[in-house]
C-alpha cells in the first residue's frame, strides 16, 4: 500500500471490552505510528465491559473522550462506531473526525433502513457533528450473491451518490465490493471526484421524512456539488 501511495485505516473492534482497549491504547497507537497509520475506526459491538455499563452511559462517554485524547497525543484521527451521539466535541478535538452514532448503511444487510431514514438524519443526528454513514451501495439486489435471497437494499444507485453530498463527513467510505464498482465506473468516478469537506453549504429544499436537496462548495475550490435524497415516493 505504501509503495502505491495508499493510506490504510486501522480498525480497532473492541468487542465492547472498553476496559481492555484502554489498557492497550498506548501500544496500539504506537504500532499505528510505526507503520504509517494516521486514522483509526473504533468499534464497540456487543455488551459493554465493564458489566453494567452501556454504550451511552457516563462511563462510556468518558471512555470515548479518553480515546480521543490519547489519539490526539499520537496525531491520530478517530472515526468512532457504536459510540455516543456527538455533541460538538469535534470542534474541540478536530482529530475526532467522524462518528457513526445512528443506523448507518451496514443495516441494509440486517433488515434495511426505511427509505425516509436518510431524509431525517440531517435534521437530527447531523446536528451534533459529522457522521460516517458509509454509503456507496451499487449492488442493491442480494440475489446477486444468493440466488434464493429475496432481500434488497432500500435504495438506488443514484441515491447512494447523493448521500456523499447530503451526509457530511470529512472521511468518506465506499462500502461495496470492488467488482461492483468496476461494473459502474462512470458512477464510481463521482465518488472519486466528490469533495469531503466544504466552504459553504446551502439547503435548496427539504421536508424532513420526505426529501432533502443540498448544495456544497468544495473547500478551497470554486466547484459546487449538488445531491439529493428522497423517501420511497
Spans of features found by a protein language model:
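Alpha-helix capping/termination and helix-coil
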Residues: 71, 75, 170-174, 195-198, ...
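Short, glycine-/Ser/Thr-/acidic-enriched flexible segments
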Residues: 15, 83-85, 138, 171-173, ...
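A mature extracytoplasmic/lumenal domain signature
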Residues: 44-46, 178-180, 230
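Aromatic- and carboxylate-enriched substrate-binding clefts and catalytic-loop regions
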Residues: 1-152, 156
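Catalytic cores of secreted or luminal carbohydrate-active enzymes
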Residues: 158-207
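Short catalytic-loop micro-motif centered on adjacent basic/acidic residues
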Residues: 79, 176, 225-227
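Carbohydrate-binding surface patches
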Residues: 208-233
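Structural beta-strand/beta-sheet cores of well-ordered domains, especially the beta-sheet scaffolds
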Residues: 8, 74-76, 95, 129, ...
Amino acid at each position: 500500500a505504501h509503495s502505491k501511495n495508499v493510506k490504510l485505516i486501522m480498525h480497532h473492534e473492541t468487542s465492547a471490552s472498553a476496559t481492555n482497549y484502554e489498557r492497550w491504547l498506548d501500544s496500539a497507537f504506537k504500532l499505528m505510528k510505526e507503520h504509517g497509520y494516521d486514522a483509526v475506526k473504533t468499534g464497540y459491538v456487543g455488551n459493554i465491559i465493564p458489566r453494567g455499563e452501556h454504550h451511552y452511559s457516563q462511563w462510556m462517554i468518558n471512555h470515548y473522550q479518553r480515546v480521543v485524547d490519547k489519539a490526539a497525543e499520537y496525531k491520530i484521527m478517530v472515526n468512532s462506531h457504536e459510540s455516543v451521539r456527538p455533541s460538538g466535541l469535534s470542534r474541540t478535538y478536530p482529530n475526532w473526525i467522524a462518528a457513526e452514532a445512528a443506523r448507518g448503511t451496514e443495516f441494509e444487510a440486517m433488515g434495511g433502513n426505511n427509505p425516509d431514514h436518510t431524509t431525517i438524519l440531517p435534521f437530527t443526528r447531523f446536528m451534533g457533528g459529522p457522521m460516517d454513514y458509509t454509503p456507496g451501495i451499487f449492488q442493491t439486489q442480494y440475489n446477486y450473491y444468493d440466488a434464493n435471497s429475496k432481500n434488497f437494499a432500500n435504495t438506488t444507485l443514484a441515491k447512494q451518490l447523493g448521500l456523499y453530498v447530503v451526509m457530511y463527513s470529512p472521511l468518506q467510505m465506499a462500502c461495496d465490493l470492488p467488482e461492483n464498482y468496476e461494473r459502474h465506473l462512470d458512477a464510481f468516478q463521482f465518488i472519486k471526484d466528490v469533495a469531503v469537506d466544504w466552504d459553504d453549504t446551502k439547503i435548496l429544499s427539504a421536508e424532513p421524512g420526505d426529501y432533502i436537496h443540498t448544495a456544497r462548495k468544495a473547500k478551497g475550490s470554486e466547484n459546487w456539488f449538488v445531491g439529493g435524497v428522497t423517501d420511497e415516493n
